[in-house]
C-alpha cells in the first residue's frame, strides 16, 4: 500500500482514502455540482447536467481507486486522470455560465474549488515522486 502523508497532521500516515483531505474536498465538490445542475433546464438532464455530474463523481472516485493501488506509479496515473477530470469539469462549468445556466458568482466559486483540488492533486503527485 502507498505510504501517503498528505493531511493536516503530517505525523499521521493515511490508512484509508476517506481520511485524505483531497478526497473529502472532492466529495464536497460532487455535492455542489449536483445542487448546481439541478437548476439546469430539463432538456439538459441527459446532456450537460449528466456529463458534469459524472465528471465530478470521477474526481474523488479516481483518488480513492488510485489510493488502493499497491504501487505509487499506479496511484499517480489515477491522480493524472483526476487532473484531467478537473479540467473537463472546469470547462463544463464555464460552458454552463456561457449558456446562462449559472451566474458569475456560482461559476467563480466552483472554479475556485476545482482549482484547489487540482493544486492538491499536483502536490500529491510530486510527493509520490
Stretch-by-stretch model annotation:
Residues 1-129:
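Amphipathic alpha-helical assembly/interaction segments
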